[in-house]
């Protein structure tokens, strides 16, 4: 199906029964996702996303449920680097990424939603402005996607009667930070991990180190 076929299919939706239109719409989105994956695979210069070992339909459903709950309750944390008028667009892109893609797709599509400059505090304590780092979109996309992915894994583990999840390195690092290296291979209570990533207080020091920016760590089912 080429881009003209997709356009024709979309226009035809309005003339089809609701069930058929919904199925066709889903098929179109899946084809677009496959096309993106194929084009991405042919470009080895792209930065690699984290390796999400349990990023399957079941985990995606649980992760989306977590995101939708945050948005509905007003608990969603929007980065200060997002333009205030772009938060809703970013939430939509994040949901789309969780449903079909990964953090790299989110980075590529959210880059234009960031501010150009941000406030900074100098060593003397003075306030100034500085250009947002080039890696800002990567850090934002990776951090948010991985956080909801981990929440999805933890929620899935609980629903499936599993007691724990395991921390693993989702991105190769030749010189991992000592505090990150200590976490690799540890098994943590799934409920405690979920509570912490939802913003609740927990006591386990290991759990408190999950979700830190640019750590390269994630969790998987055991």
Which stretches of residues belong to each language-model region?
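Basic polycationic patches enriched in arginine
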Residues: 11, 15-16, 29-32
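Domain-core detector
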Residues: 35, 41-210, 222
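Long, His/Glu/Asp-enriched segments that create or flank divalent metal/ion-associated functional microenvironments
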Residues: 217-218
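Short, solvent-exposed loop/turn segments at the edges of secondary structure
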Residues: 212-214
């Amino acid at each position: 199906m080429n881009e003209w076929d997709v356009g024709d299919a979309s226009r035809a939706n309005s003339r089809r029964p609701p069930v058929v239109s919904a199925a066709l719409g889903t098929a179109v989105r899946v084809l677009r996702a496959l096309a993106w994956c194929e084009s991405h695979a042919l470009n080895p210069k792209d930065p690699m996303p984290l390796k999400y070992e349990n990023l399957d339909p079941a985990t995606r459903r649980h992760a989306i449920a977590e995101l939708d709950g945050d948005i509905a309750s007003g608990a969603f944390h929007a980065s200060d680097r997002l333009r205030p008028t772009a938060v809703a667009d970013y939430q939509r892109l994040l949901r789309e990424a969780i449903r079909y893609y990964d953090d790299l797709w989110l980075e590529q599509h959210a880059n234009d939603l960031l501010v150009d400059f941000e406030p900074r505090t100098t060593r003397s304590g003075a306030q100034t402005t500085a250009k947002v780092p080039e890696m800002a979109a990567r850090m934002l996309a990776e951090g948010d996607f991985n956080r909801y992915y981990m929440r999805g894994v933890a929620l899935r583990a609980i629903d499936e009667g599993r007691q724990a999840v395991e921390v693993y390195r989702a991105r190769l690092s030749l010189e991992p930070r000592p505090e990150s290296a200590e976490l690799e291979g540890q098994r943590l209570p799934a409920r405690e991990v979920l509570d912490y990533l939802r913003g609740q207080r927990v006591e386990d020091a290991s759990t408190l180190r999950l979700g830190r920016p640019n750590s390269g760590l994630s969790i998987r089912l055991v």
